[in-house]
Every structure is written in C-alpha cells, then in structure tokens.
Amino acid sequence: LETPGEEVDNRSLEEILSSIPPPPPPAMASEAGAPRLMITHIVNQNFKSCAGEKILGPFHKRFSCIIGPNGSGKSNVIDSMLFVFGYRAQKIRSKKLSVLIHNSDEHKDIQSCTVEVHFQKIIDKEGDDYEVIPNSNFCVSRTAYRDNTSVYHISGKKRTFKDVGNLLRSHGIDLDHNRFLILQGEVEQIAMMKPKGQTEHDEGMLEYLEDIIGCGRLNEPIKVLCRRVEILNENRGEKLNRVKMVEKEKDAVEGEKNIAIEFLTLEKEMFKKKNHVCQYYIYDLQKRIDEMKTQKEKIHEDTKEITEKSNMLSNEMKAKNSAVKDIEKKLHKATKFIEENKEKFRQLDLEDVQVREKLKHATSKAKKLEKQLQKDKEKVEELKSIPAKSKTIINETTTKSSSLEKEKEKEEKKLKEVMDSLKQETQGLQKEKEDQEKELMGFNKSVNEARSKMEVAQSELDIYLSRHNTAVSQLSKAKETLITASETLKERKAAIGEINTKLPQTQQELKEKEKELQKLTQEEINLKSLVHDLFQKVEEAKSSLAMNRSRGKVLDAIIQEKKSGRIPGIYGRLGDLGAIDEKYDIAISSCCHALDYIVVDSIDTAQECVNFLKRHNIGVATFIGLDKMTVWAKKMAKIQTPENTPRLFDLVKAKNEEIRQAFYFALRDTLVADNLDQATRVAYQKDRRWRVVTLQGQIIEQSGTMTGGGSKVMRGRMGSSVIVEISEEEVNKMESQLQKHSKQARRIQEQKVQHEERVVKLRHSEREMRNTLEKFAASIQGLSDQEEYLTVQIKELEANVLTTAPDKKKQKLLEENVSAFKKEYDAVAEKAGKVEAEVKRLHDTIIEINNRKLKAQQNKLDMINKQLDECASAITKAQVAIKTADRNLIKAQDSVVRTEKEIKDTEKETNDLKAELKAIEDKAEEVIKKTNAAEESLPEIQKEHRNLLQELKVIQENEHALQKDALSIKLKLEQIDGHIAEHNSKIKYWQKEISKIKLHPIEDNPVETVSVLSPEDLEAIKNPDSITNQIAILEAQCHEMKPNLGAIAEYKKKEELYLQRVAELDKITSERDNFRQAYEDLRKQRLNEFMAGFYIITNKLKENYQMLTLGGDAELELVDSLDPFSEGIMFSVRPPKKSWKKIFNLSGGEKTLSSLALVFALHHYKPTPLYFMDEIDAALDFKNVSIVAFYIYEQTKNAQFIIISLRNNMFEISDRLIGIYKTYNITKSVAVNPKEIASKGLC
C-alpha cells in the first residue's frame, strides 16, 4: 500500500483541515488614505566606504533617487539596507562580515560597523504632505565585529534575527521572495522564470504567483489528502475482495455442515450402545481375575522349602567368588606390570628414533651453514669495490655538465639578439595600426549619432501607430481564439461519442483476455511441475545407469549370472540395496566395510557364486546369505542410546525387511555422533561401551581404539536413494517424454506472454479512454461559455479598429523621415567597416612575423637543458649507489658473524644428541630385565585361579538343579499372572474404548454425558452379540456418509468472519468518501483562489505593458488551459510592431520593460510599502527611461521607491535626490529637493 521509506500523514481529517492557515491578509491597503510604512533616513557608521557616522536622507515618502559617479558608493546604500535585513555577506558583495568594516589610510583598525534604518507609519495627504501615525516610529540596526559576528537591535533593544524578520514581515516587507528588492542586473530575471519549477525546491512563475496570491498554503494539505485517498482506495479494494472471498467460502461449506449434523446424530446412538457393551466386557473379565488370584495364593505355600536350600548355596557361592576375585586381582596386577614395562620399552624405542632423526637433521644443517658462510664472504669483497667505481662516474659526468653550462650561456645570448631584431622589424607596422585605430574611433562616434537619430524617428512613428495596431492585433487574436475554441468544442464532442462506443468493446475484450490468461497461468504451473518431476526421474535413472556401468568386474560378472538366470538367488551389492541421507555418507562409508559384500538368498547360492568365480579365475568376493540373517530380527527394534544419539542402522532405508536384517548384521548398534567430543562422551559409558562413528569418519571401537580421520575420507559407498535396475531403453523413453512436455510448456509460456502484453495494452487503453472522457466532459461547458463571450468581444473590437484609424498623410511623412535617417546611418557604418578590416589585417601580420623567427633558436636551448638534466640524474644515481653499498657491506659482515655462531651452536647440539641417545639405550636394557622376571612368576598364579574356578562350577551345578524346580513353580505362577495381565490388558482396552466415547454437541444443543450401568443392569444383559450387531449396522451407515465434521465449526467461523469483514468494509468506505470529498473541495478552493488573483494580475500586466511601451501587449498564459497547476504559467510579450514572443527571445530593454510591468502588476494586486531598485534603467533607451520614470511617479503613489540611477530622464522626475560622492576615500551624501530648487530658480 505504501512504498518502503514513505512517511504517511496519519492525522484525522479534522486535524488536517484545521491545520490549513487562513488566506494571508494584505500588508497594506491600496486605497488612498490607508496607513503605510516608509523609511525616513539611514545612519551608517564605519560601514564599507563610510567613515564615522553618515546620515543618508531624509527620503521622500514616494520617489527618491540616489545619484553619483561610478565608485562613489551608491550601491553601498542598498548594501546597508540588505545588511540590516539580515542578508549574508556574499549577497552584500563581501566574503565575510568583517570586510564590511571601513578601512582606509585615515581610519585604520576600526573594530565594528553599524547601520540603522529608521521607519515610521504615515497616512498620505495632498502633494508631498503626510501625517505620521503616533508611536509608529521604530529603528532597526545591525552591528558587525572584526570576529565576523553581528548583533541586532530594535529601537535600541537587543533582538535576534528572527525577531527582526517577524517585525519587518508584519509591516509588509517581503523578505521571503524579495519583491521589494531589485539589485543591479536582476531586473530581467523576474520575468524569465520558468513556467513551473522543475523540482520540489525549484521556483517557477507558477510557484511565484501562488505564494503572492496565497493559495500555495493549500498545496501540502492537497498532497496529503490525495495520498490518503489513494491508500484508502487500495485498502477498500482489499477489504471488498476479502468480503467476497469469505462469502464464497461460507456458502461452499454450508452443504457439508448439514451432512455433518446428520452424521453426528447417528454416531451418538452408536456410541451409547458401544458404551453398554464395553461396560459388560469389563464386568465379566473382572470376575475371572478374582478366581485366578485365589488359585495363585495356594501355589505360593509350596515354594518356601526350595527357597531355604537356594539361600545356603548362595552363601557358599559368595565365599568362592570372593576368593576368585582376590586371585584375579593378583593376576591382573602381574599382567598390568608386564604391559606397563612393555609400554615403557615402546616409548623408549620411539624416543630413540626421534633423537636419531634430530641428529641426522643437525648434521645436514651444519653442511648448509658452511656453504652459506662461503657465499657471505664473497659478497663482502664485492661490496667493498662499489664506491671506487661510482666516484669515477661522478667525476666524468661533472666535467660534461660544466661544458654544457657554457654552451647554454652562448645560446641564451643568441636568443636575446633574435628577440631584439624582431622588435625593430615590426615597429613600422605597429605605428600604422595605431593610426588606423584612431581613425576608427572617430567613425564610431558618427555611427552612434546616426543610429540614435534613426531610432528616435522610428519611435515617433511607432507611438503614432500604436493604438490602431493594438486594436487590429486584439481583433485578430480574438477571431483566432474563437476559431480555436469552436474547433476544440466540436472535436471534443466527437471524441466523447467515439469513446462511448469503443469503451464497452475494450472492457469486454479485457475480461475475455484476463480469463484466458488465468487459464494459461494454471496450465503453465501444472506443466512446469510435471516437467520438474520428470527431469528428476530422468536424472536419477541416468545416475543409476551410470553406477551400474561403473561396477567392478567381480560384481559385474555376478550380476550377469543373475540376469542370465543361471544363478537366480542373487540380490546385489549390499550398499546398492539401501539408501541414507547424504549427511551420513562419510560416516557409513568409513565404518561399514560390509557395504561391498554381495547379498544372496542362501548359503547354497553363495557357494555357487564362489565356485563360479574360481572356475573362471575372475577374483574373490564376500557373500551374505539372507537365510542366516533371521537371528538378528529381534535386535533390530529401537533401543535407548546415550544422549539419544541416532543408531546408524535406523537411518538406513532398505528395499524390504530381509535386506534390513543384512544391514543390521553389517552395522549392529553403531551410533553416529556430530563430532569427536560427542563421540568420546557417548562411547565410554559406565554400564556399556558403544561403537561410535562421527560425521567426519572418525571411529571409536568398543575396545577403545580410535581409527579414521585424516585429510582423505571415504565417501560414496552408499547413495541417498535405493538404486533401481533400469535399462537404457527405459531412460531414452523417459527423456522423450520429458522433451515432449518441455516443448508443450514453452508453447504455453509464449501464449501467456502474448496474452499478458495484450492485457496490459487493453488496461492502458481503457484507463486512457476513461481519463479522456472525464477531462473532455469537464471542459465542454467552459468552451461553450468562452465561445459566447468571444462572439460579443469581436463586435466591440471591430468598432474600436474603426475609431483608432491613423491619418495617412502624417503616417507617410513620418515614414519618409525614418528612411532618410536610415540611409545616413548605412553610409557612415560602411566607412567604419573598411577601417576596422585594415586594423585586423595589420594585427595578423605582426603576429605571424614573431612566430616564424623565434622557434628554431628556442629548440636548441631546450636540447641543452635536457642533456644537463640527464647529467644531474647520473650523478645522483652514483651517489645513492655509494651510500647503499656502505649499508649493504655492514649487513653482509653481520651475516658472516651470524653464520659462524650458528655453526658453533649446531656442533654443540650434535654432541648433546649423542649423549641423550646413550642414556635412552641404558634405560631400555633395564626395562627388559624387569619384564622377564615378572613373566617367570605368572604361571603359578594362573594355576591357582583355574582350581578355584573348578570348585565354583560344582556349586553352580547344584544351584541349577534347585533353580530347575523353582522354575517349574515359577512357570505356573507366570502362566496365571499372564492370564491376569491379559485380562487386565483387555479391561484397560475396554476402559480406553469407553474413554474414547465422546458425545459431540449437535448445533446449539447441550453436551450429553455417557451413562454408567449398575451391576444389576450388567447381569441383565444376556446376549451382548445382538448389541454388537446393531453397532456394526450403525457404523456401516456412518462409514458410507463420509462427512466433514470440521465443516460445522468452519461454517460458524466463516459466518463470524463474514460479518466482521462487512463491518470493516462499511467503515473504510465511509472514511474514503469523507477524505475524497475534502480533497475535491480543497482542489476547487485552490483553483478558484488562484484564478481570481491570476486574472487581476494578468489584466493589470497587460495594462501596464501597453502604457510602458505605448502600444505593445503582454500577458500571463496558462500553458494548460484546463489545469493551471500541471504545466505552469508562460509569460508572453508582443513588443510594439512585432509578433508575439516568449520572454527568452526578447532584447535586454524589452526584458526590462516586461519585468517592470509584472512588478507593478504584482504591486497593484498585493501592495508592498517599500521598493529598492539598483540601475533598473541600464538597458533602456532615453524614451523608455522617461516612460518608466513618469509611470513610477504617477501610478505608484501608495509606496516608497528608492532608485539608484545614472539617467537624467529618471532622477530629474524624482521627488528627492540623494547625492553620493567620495573624497579622501570616504563616501559622503547630500539630500536635495528638486522641486524646491526649481521654484527658487536655482536650476
């Protein structure tokens, strides 16, 4: 339902809707007389080019211009305001804050700078007058220090940047989008934004307008609600499927439930009768047991005399056994002494071998060390000769390097002479080039003047024709829009009709293809399962055939005799007649040598096989006769083992019970352990020793000896499945069947892929048709309204074209004036072009002369430098060789000393080993003497032991005679006990049968208990067989029914689950509908808010651009007219007398005018009290500068504009001039009121 890592907003609908903020209120009213914010003055203290305290202002309430020469510090005024408003140092054209502190020759080591911006709220009055709102004055300041830290103050109190930002935003200063701020070169970028941001964090025209209009606050809630609706739809679909599935399962079980209830009714009657019969049998058996117990008490009286005689013989037996134990201890002690001495001798023998090996190794080592000493001495002599050779190389190379240095000085002098000669050669060409460049500068001045006259004449003509051209353009555009709307309306109505026809057909075909795809999928699963099983069988058959072929010649000959029928009783090799898990392969291969024995039916068959092998001289083999294996049948039962370790025999799977007996003969009670530690624990138990093998093939015998292990282990002597005799023809037949089904599976898979592709296409087509149908149906009404509106608008525009028609005579006069100026411009431009071409030719000639003569001499000098580098490298290598030889000589001498020491140590070791060998030989001689003495005294002890055993045998024979009599009596008792036990067993059986009887509840009826009959009732039963017959009839009826008793509980469970699933579906459906309605309402609210603001802004933009360009046109277009948020907003402009263009294709001046028109339109929609603009008129000609200046002065009377400008058309119209000038590296300012000066006649 949700992608991994996705965070889903799980808030309730009420919480999501309540978290949406209300539409932002306007920062200030656009009506006259409304209060607004203005800057009174700015105080700079040691900020950038200002030293000490400098006051800028006072600023006018409407239009102030900052003027001054380049480099005087005009832009620092903007920087000071940016500094206070919290911008980073890089935005203020500095790398860090400390750079903002003033630094000049007169003022050094200043530790801080401060900027204060003073604000007040006013109400405009007539002219330049205004009323200050009481207590509205406040001052925001920021101080930066040398350590790049800064602090903020509001009206003298220390505050954080967040407090400053909140205060300025509350008064309408847009710090988030910087609409109040247009820096140098940034005016064009406003209108050049992309229609829509390309990424989540990118901002395009759509996002820019959304933030201003205020509907951007709805974006996140819409996304949250959309995602929640998607998740709820997916959850609801899942719940609906579950309801349908449970309902289907419930209906399917109902029939079986009814049969089960009928069955339980019959079973209840049968159990009641069975209960009566079982109680009768228990009662009858108990009577017989009581009679046998009386008989048993009489026999016990006859056993007392035999018991007394047995006790006497038992005491005598104990005495003799004690004597036997004493003599056995003495015998054991003598035997143990002999064994210990033999073991000592074996140990000494082993030590003797080890010492002799060490002695041999020491002798060999001494010879090797002698050879190594000789090599080390030769190496010392070689290293002593290296320094002399290296010094000879250094002397020769140093001499060669000195001669090359002298040659280098000569070549460098030659290079300098060549360079001096080139300078004199090109002197005349340089003079001629400078004269031509001076002439070109004069021509350029004439070209600029001619171009200016031509553009002024063209502007006058454009202004005169602008109203008529605008009217004609609007009429043409309205007609084109009407045609487009009518055609679109007609096309969409036709498309709706076509979709309504095709959609049902597509849906029907999709259902059919989905059914066929489901059928093919099931068929593919079945075929793949069949192919997989066949493949395994073929592989097993091939493996069996290969194993049969790889048998030895003896086994092969015996099997051949079996197949021919000459010796019919042969089964085969024992390992091939059984199977074991691959985990135990190594264990059984290591511990069971009998796996290669050949199994036959009898000893006679085995003898026939032996005779056959001898007769044909094939070899020998060991045989197992199954007729002799029956003795092991009783021991094959499961046994209790230490730590429940598995018995290897129990893990073997054999063909039949007879073969299992042969495997027990081969394995007996051998256990298999995981590792050697467990095997050791299991093998040595107190009461018994076990034969144990590990999974790694290590074996512990019952005697305690351990074998196996090592790097090579035995494996593969027994397979994981019983080998079946199979012919090559059968294998071929199975392979043919496998190929047939594999081919069929591939064909089904290809059909499935084709159907899947078709289903995907049909689903996509159905979805596309549904989306298109919804989209077209929604747009029909809008297109109809647009068609009616445009018909009325065209009539109005046709009347407007007639009223704005120009005077033909005046138009012709202006056009002739433009043509005359153009001819004058073309003539001057042609002369300037010829002079410019001559300057380029002279420049190229000078460059070519320099390159030709300088190259050869430079190559000679480079070759000498290369040889000097090679000499230096050779000297360095020789010096390194001298140093290395000294170090290596010390190492070689150390090696000689070390080798001589090792030779001495080896001689000492050899002597020590010879002495040790002599000591071992002496100890061995003493051990042999002690062993011989003990063996001489052993026969006398053994004779005494045999006499005691003979006496013990006589006592045992007497005891056996008594035991025979006791056994006869015991057998009688056991016979009686056997009958009693048998009757008790039958009683337990019938009691168990009664305990099994449980009367099941039928539907909601209470559970009945089983009745207990009294002795009188049981005696009254004369014929239990008739009840048994009735039970048999009822059992037959029940057996024929074959009900599913679980169907009752399953039906109840399904019914409960069905009701639960329906309740869950209703709940999630209601929740989904609420979220979907809220989602649609928010989308409509966002669209309505955006389009209301958008129409106001685009209409004002059109009006502003027409006014600024005197006839041009501009508008904000929806890229997708049906959904403004899908593709964004495109800014299109039609400059005067030009076609419609995208903003990116305009000239610099046209982009500036377009951007300013948009800025003033946004100001009209959402007024901002302050605007700071830095040289926004840089790309405009004098006419457009005047138009922009008059517009600012006349149309924006409800805001304060502070503009940096160098164009007199701009600053002469302003209400207040702030002059900036710099003397002695310090910026100063002066405020002038132009109107006041003009009124006094001072200008």
UniProtKB/Swiss-Prot annotation:
Sites bearing Phosphoserine, chain numbering: S98, S937, S1011
GO CC term (a single one): nuclear lumen
GO molecular function ontology, one term from the record: ATP hydrolysis activity
Binding site for ATP: G68, P69, N70, G71, S72, G73, K74, S75
Protein keywords: Acetylation, ATP-binding, Cell cycle, Cell division, Chromosome, Coiled coil, Cytoplasm, DNA condensation, Mitosis, Nucleotide-binding, Nucleus, Phosphoprotein
Region described as Disordered: spans on this chain: 1-30
InterPro entries to which the protein is assigned, alphabetical: P-loop_NTPase, RecF/RecN/SMC_N, SMC, SMC_hinge, SMC_hinge_sf
Coarse class of the protein's main subcellular location: nucleus
SMC hinge domain sequence ranges: 568-682
UniProt function note: Central component of the condensin complex, a complex required for conversion of interphase chromatin into mitotic-like condense chromosomes. The condensin complex probably introduces positive supercoils into relaxed DNA in the presence of type I topoisomerases and converts nicked DNA into positive knotted forms in the presence of type II topoisomerases.
Swiss-Prot/TrEMBL domain comment: The SMC hinge domain, which separates the large intramolecular coiled coil regions, allows the heterodimerization with SMC2, forming a V-shaped heterodimer.
Assembly notes: Forms a heterodimer with SMC2. Component of the condensin complex, which contains the SMC2 and SMC4 heterodimer, and three non SMC subunits that probably regulate the complex: BRRN1/CAPH, CNAP1/CAPD2 and CAPG.
Protein name, UniProt field: Structural maintenance of chromosomes protein 4
UniProt organism field: Microtus arvalis
